[in-house]
């Protein structure tokens, strides 16, 4: 393992790490991954992670984690901000920083709605309710983006990586969900066209699925 490489630890799924992976790729950061594998049903053995969870000198042991020399960070958005600060991707003006802060929190609230649905044993019965309210939520993001190029304004920031990932997961869940929102679709295309992102999406380091872990009711399988 290179002493100069960051180490990203997470389950072998997209989950909360996908936006981090994309930001690492976009910023040309040298990194390696430590992927932990969850066991199969019915036990879903998590011992690969639990056996080392309290041995890594993490203040709040959890996944994902990022290790960068003496800096050891948990909480996915704290990791994103840590990387983004190194590359001036947290917004420049006060307006940009406010928009970044709003989006960081709003998109995570939105993410967790889909996460809770996907891991709920009553998933199939709850899915119609989620889909019914989805357009209203997407409309809010569409209005917030407006005619801006990126969600903070005209400057690419880490929340664009976060937002792309969450919108993409919803697009996989309901393929037509963005059709009513041309500016969101254009945002997705712009993001995918970024040179480093386009290269990552075509690389063997990228995987579309699984989004969730094996105990989830949706998004828990690889695409063959």
Swiss-Prot record:
Keyword field: Cytoplasm, Phosphoprotein, Transferase
InterPro entries, per database record: Glutathione-S-Trfase_C-like (IPR010987), Glutathione-S-Trfase_C_sf (IPR036282), Glutathione_S-Trfase (IPR040079), Glutathione_S-Trfase_N (IPR004045), GST_C (IPR004046), GST_mu (IPR003081), GST_superfamily (IPR050213), Thioredoxin-like_sf (IPR036249)
GO biological process: cellular detoxification of nitrogen compound; glutathione metabolic process; nitrobenzene metabolic process; response to estrogen; xenobiotic catabolic process
Binding site for glutathione: 10-11, 49-53, 62-63, 75-76
One GO location term (cellular component): sperm fibrous sheath
Chain positions found as Phosphoserine: 5
Catalytic activity: RX + glutathione = an S-substituted glutathione + a halide anion + H(+)
Gene3D superfamilies in the cross-refs: 1.20.1050.10, Glutaredoxin
One term of GO molecular function: enzyme binding
Subcellular location: Cytoplasm
Residue ranges annotated for the GST C-terminal domain, each copy included: 93-211
Annotated substrate binding sites: 119
SUPFAM superfamilies: GST C-terminal domain-like, Thioredoxin-like
Domain GST N-terminal: 4-91
Cross-referenced PANTHER family: GLUTATHIONE S-TRANSFERASE (PTHR11571), GLUTATHIONE S-TRANSFERASE MU 3 (PTHR11571:SF133)
Main function: Conjugation of reduced glutathione to a wide number of exogenous and endogenous hydrophobic electrophiles.
Assembly notes: Homodimer. Interacts with PFKM isoform 2 and isoform 3 (via N-terminal testis-specific region).
Protein name (database record): Glutathione S-transferase Mu 5
């Amino acid at each position: 393992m290179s002493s100069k490489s960051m180490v990203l630890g997470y389950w072998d799924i997209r989950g909360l790490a996908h936006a981090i992976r994309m930001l690492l790729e976009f910023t040309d950061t040298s990194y390696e991954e430590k992927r932990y594998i969850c066991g199969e049903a019915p036990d879903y053995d998590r011992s690969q992670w639990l056996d080392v969870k309290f041995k890594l000198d993490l203040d709040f042991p959890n996944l994902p984690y990022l290790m960068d020399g003496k800096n050891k960070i948990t909480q996915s958005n704290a990791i994103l901000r840590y990387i983004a600060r190194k590359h001036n991707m947290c917004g420049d003006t006060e307006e940009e920083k406010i928009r970044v802060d709003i989006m960081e929190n709003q998109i995570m609230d939105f993410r967790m709605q889909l996460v809770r649905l996907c891991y709920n044993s009553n998933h199939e019965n709850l899915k119609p309710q989620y889909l019914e309210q989805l357009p209203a939520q997407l409309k809010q993001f569409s209005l917030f983006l407006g005619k801006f190029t990126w969600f903070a304004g005209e400057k690419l920031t880490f929340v664009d990586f976060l937002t792309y990932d969450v919108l993409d997961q919803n697009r996989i869940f309901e393929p037509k969900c963005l059709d009513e929102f041309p500016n969101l679709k254009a945002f997705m295309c712009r993001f995918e066209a970024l040179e480093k992102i386009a290269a990552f999406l075509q690389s063997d380091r990228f995987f579309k699925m699984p989004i969730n872990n094996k105990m989830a009711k949706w998004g828990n399988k690889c695409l063959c």
